[in-house]
Amino acid sequence: MSKYKRYAIVVILVSNGILISFLESFIPIPIPVPGVKLGLGNIITMIGIAFLGVRDVLFIVAIRCFVVAVLTRGVMMLAFSLTGGILSALVMALLYKKFSSMFSVKGISIAGALVHSTAQVIVASFILGQFVIMYYLPVLLVSAVITGFITGSIGEIAINEIRRKDIFGNSPQEHTDIDFGNILHSDKSDTLIKKHQILPKMDSGVKLFFAFILSIIPFLCENQISFIIISAYLIFITIFSGMKVRTVLTSFTAYFIIVVFPFLFGFLISLLFYQISGNAMFTYYQQISDTAIRMFQLFLLWYIGCIYFNTTPMKSFIGLFDKILTPFKRFGVPVEDHLKVIMCVIKVLTQIGPEVKRSFTESMSSMSDNKKWWSRINIKGISGIIVNFIVNSFKRMDAIEKYVKEVNAADLYNYRLKVSRLDIVASVSFVIVVFLVIIIENGYLM
């Protein structure tokens, strides 16, 4: 298999995984638990394990986690999704390659879901510095068995259908009517950024430097006034940038579900066990105020990332990322090719994403006319929708392979430092805020 054909397959599978996840909003989870999703995107991981090498599977997982984190403006989520995704992929690959006679695809999917949930809880516990989050793990493990079985059932049907049609074989693929040459000229990768926003006009590198420093400062602060100043500054930036209220609320909600709720659940369980048993093992020793400060510090980090990616053009950010990764090029790492793959995924999503979502909506609506929740967990029907979508998506493989091979990286992403008057004004305001925090932390105003 040529390098560019492999890249084309990665582009198709990653974009498929992200688009398939849209179906989750139509499928109720039998046991609704905050932070738990069906994980339909993991079907793509299982397909990769069945037909590709482990290295390609890890590449697919890494690209999918990165693209989702950037597009959903939740870059802090990368630590959770990447850790869980990589570990679960390795476990599923091991079971499929070495123990397929002992485990079915459903069983392998359940194992992957268990590992994914465990890894994410451990990461959350480590980041927050709170062991009580581990009390939330049993709830997630029970949910993982259910969601893993559903995902594995669909994945098994998809794998069998792909194997039957020999999609990954050497037989020529049907062509699609989508002209990927036009994608290069129709740049829709930054459609989520309003044209009237001011922050996108700032230099991406200057803005990244400010975001990085501003993310570190809260972890060095001890005075409450410093947190008030930083919060006020971020509120001003939010208003000034013209961010949607929905985006802000989504950021708050996501942080609560992923970080705050597991802690509160674990804390209450710990308190309950202590009241029942009186065992000191369940005592919560840390001050609530210290925990609240830690959560607030992490939220500021979370929200700063949200602001940055919500106001930064994708082409500019990927171009800046290319500059940052320049040292790796000297060691033979194909940075340019990998970034081209990322941009191609984004372009495929923006080009066909709306139409795919409409198609999914119509298909799922026709399956749930009686409005009963269990009628929407129609594994066979959902499998048919997903399999047809995946099979049809490979009709674009030849076009995508040619596009990835011939397109110039400079046409996909670029970055050049350009300091404007807006950058200077932003720098002055940033320096003032940092100066105020420094003098407050040193007690000069107290």
Per-range role (PLM):
Residues 21-38, 61-92, 105, 132:
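Interfacial aromatic-anchored transmembrane helix boundaries in multi-pass membrane proteins
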Residues 52-55, 73-76, 101, 130, ...:
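Transmembrane helix interruption/hinge and helix-loop junction motifs
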Residues 8-15, 19, 60, 81-115, ...:
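Short helix-perturbing small/polar motifs within transmembrane alpha-helices
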Residues 1-48, 180-212, 216-221, 225:
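Hydrophobic transmembrane alpha-helices
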Residues 40-56, 91-96, 214-218, 233-238:
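Generic transmembrane alpha-helix motif of multi-pass integral membrane proteins
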Residues 74, 78-79, 101-172:
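Membrane-embedded alpha-helical hairpins and interfacial helices in multi-pass inner-membrane proteins
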